[in-house]
Amino acid sequence: MFQSLIAIDYGKARIGLASGQMITKTATPIGTVEAYDGVPNWIELDKIVKRWNPSDIVIGLPLDTQDFETDITKAAKDFAKEVKERYKRNVHLINEAYSTREARWRLEEVKSKKVSHIKVDALAACVILETWMAEN
């Protein structure tokens, strides 16, 4: 059974992160890890995985609006394989369509003074995790 979870909003420049619990079906933004052309700062990601010690990791799969794969979809799948091998955790992929749009909307709803990329990416990871938990 799933216990604690981490969700990842994969991106070429930044990777958004959220943590969650299946028992409460809630997700909380953790922050972001910088990436260079899709390669994350593995040292920082290692620290986060060690600290949160998730049973499973959920990774958003970037598809286009008609659920077709894009250039970044392959990069996200390769990243997911690396995460699975590196951390020896179950990795789940989920369509992340509109997660960034939903994150921006949520920040605007709470009148966040500064809608930064960091906030958006971490909140997008929350949306990904909430969606996955609702389906599982």
UniProtKB/Swiss-Prot annotation:
Keywords, alphabetical: Cytoplasm, Hydrolase, Nuclease, Ribosome biogenesis
E.C. numbers: 3.1.-.-
Broad class of where this protein is predominantly found: cytoplasm
CDD domains, per the entry: YqgF
Species: Francisella philomiragia subsp. philomiragia (strain ATCC 25017 / CCUG 19701 / FSC 153 / O#319-036)
Role, per record: Could be a nuclease involved in processing of the 5'-end of pre-16S rRNA.
Pfam families the UniProt entry points to: RuvX
GO cellular component terms given for this protein: cytosol
GO BP terms: rRNA 5'-end processing
The UniProt record lists the keyword Transcription: no
Broad class of enzyme this protein falls into: hydrolase
Annotated compartments: Cytoplasm
Protein name in the entry: Putative pre-16S rRNA nuclease
Protein family: Belongs to the YqgF nuclease family.
Membrane-spanning parts: none
SUPFAM superfamilies, A to Z: Ribonuclease H-like
GO molecular function: nuclease activity
